Amino acid sequence: TTVTVRAQDDNTTPRRKALGSMALRLSSGRAEATVTVVQSPTVAPQTVVMYLPWSGNLYTHFLQNIEDVKKAVAGNILHDSRLLLFLQTSTTKGTLSELYYDNGECRETELRTYEDLDVTQAETITGIFDYIKQTAPAERYGITIGSHGMAWIPASGSGRSAADAKAGTEPAATTAPEKWHWEYVSPDGQFTRWFGDGGSRCTNTTTFAEAITAAGIRFEYILFDDCFMSSIEVAYDLRKITRHLIASPCEVMAYGYPYDLVMPYLFTDGGTEYDLDGVCRSFYEFYEQYEAPKYNCGAIAVTVCGQVEQMAKVMRLINNASPAYIPDPEKPLQQYEYLYAPTRFFDLADYVYQLCDDTALLKEFDEQLARTVPERYRLHTEYFYSDGKRPITTYSGISTSAPSTSGIVVNNIQHTGWYKATH
């Protein structure tokens, strides 16, 4: 038997409101109970969205991620906050549902189904988040995004036909197509996680920023469960729609974040706050042990987006004061992938230290980096994974594509907001 009590008026206060109690007695037998009736606030302390667009071979991993989230919710972590799940079941279909706690279990209620979805379009994404705002209004919003990732590189510029030839060499049409990083699967089935489906239906970071701006949301954090998304170019694109970026500068194993461990840190203090230290620490500690000794690889960092524009000002000074970057074969840069030739992503600080020899500017850079990517959030295992275990010798927690000679990078990077702000 289900008993539903509906209040006549909304609870416009920030806390639960006691409405009274109900005495219940079963018609058969003598069982009795008194139930306290409370009304949750109309506007939740926070709404967190788990956003899982279609990502091809990651779908089964998404289902495991959802089960891990449900384990956490069953621990009664939400209280008056809300957790919504957007899941695409194909390239064009999806559902929006709510996960909630009920008597020691996590339950799921479907809110809306979608047909003919195209989440590469800003209008579609805006529509999804407009509905989320109406359905689950909150004082603050957070989001986790699970998919394949390719940092800032535009979907239109990263298809196989564009190739990844070194800039200035043979034209793209004559170069052989190469695999994406998520197509490299080890003999025992392990692979890693472009912000999209791994095909042509991918969402540009600029499109996502445009869509969320139109929806009138500024997230407390975007947690990217994707490869390569801790990138200074990405952070600049998204700086106005989120306060923090939680992401990895390198590849993320296909398993993704351990959500049963991470999710409680997104609902601390009775569901009203979040703990970035706890998120990063739980990710790091999980991957120190994950499938050891072959796949225990993980790196994470947090970018404070309110500091990114100041970092751009410092980088402009460095670029203006420095000659063009020339690679030193004796001091190879820390790279964050070994699958694309030429490499696309390098450690930002390592690059700056080889680009610039002005002591005062380097000091200013270090100070600004500490504000932009705080050291306490920069955690990594000894190795990261990229078609095998690769050593991390220096780690600022954030990448740049500036030194790359990849045709895809060279043909597109000058159009990024970061490049324009720093040159």
Regions found by a protein language model. Give the residues of each.
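Interdomain boundary/hinge segments at the C-termini of tandem beta-sandwich modules
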Residues: V35-P41
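Surface-exposed loop and adjacent secondary-structure segments within mature catalytic domains
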Residues: F86-T113, R140, T144-G199
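Terminal, contiguous helix-loop blocks that mediate binding/assembly
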Residues: E170-H423
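N-terminal extension/subdomain marker
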Residues: P41-E139, Q414, Y419
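Structural recognition of the beta-strand scaffold that forms the well-ordered cores
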Residues: T47-L52, R82-L87, Y141-I145, E220-F224, ...
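Extracytoplasmic/secreted cell-surface and envelope-processing proteins
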Residues: N57-F62, T92-T95, A151-A155, M229-V234, ...
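A short beta-strand micro-motif common to beta-rich folds, especially ectodomain repeats
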Residues: V3-A7, R15-S28
